[in-house]
Amino acid sequence: NIKLNFDGIYLIMFITFEGIEGSGKSTQVKLLKAALEKIHFDVESTREPGWGRVGSLIRKIILDYDDIEIEPITELSLFCADRAQHVQEFIKPKLSQGKIVLCDRFYDSTIAYQGYGRGLDPEMVKKLGFGAALGIIPTVTFLIDISVNTALSRIIERPGRNRIDDESFEFHSRVRKSYLSLHNKQPNRICLIDGEKDIDSVQSEIRRTLRNRFSIFKRLDKLG
């Protein structure tokens, strides 16, 4: 498998996926991982929250325990604790080995959900979120954008809804608005993808963006 090693120095290729609930991020991570492995890249995929034993416990507290009330600041702290553990134990080591890492959510989610969705001070959220990332910055972020109406219609159809899935229309609207604002402020890193399209079209747009921006991904052309 191909590792990103040039003259003994490993390049960082950390690709994150963002979007409101029901945007199809997880599906796109799986499809891109399979495509990159098909052309012999060494790829790892992961998610937040929920990597590893600590992350799994934190995910269960945050998402599944609908019978307990979690204060927004507590929720933020749990997400940041999950990220610090995740970065230190998984993301940093994999990147240092020259592997491509695909991550379903990273610190942009914290800004959107806890900063704007929950109404916490955005500057405080940014500082804590970035601090928990331990200096790791995504190489590129794919923001898969869908309307809140589309999101809610997809959420209703899927099994195992969680506490955040069941938030109000207004909550999801604030989160989406925050994501679009982040894209407008950082268009070079955060690539806006139309998630209203079918799954294959979304994946094609993601691959096209990677081919156009990074020469190492030119071989994605072979996959169509």
Question: Which residues make up each language-model segment?
Answer:
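P-loop (Walker A) phosphate-binding loop of NTP-binding proteins
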Residues: 20
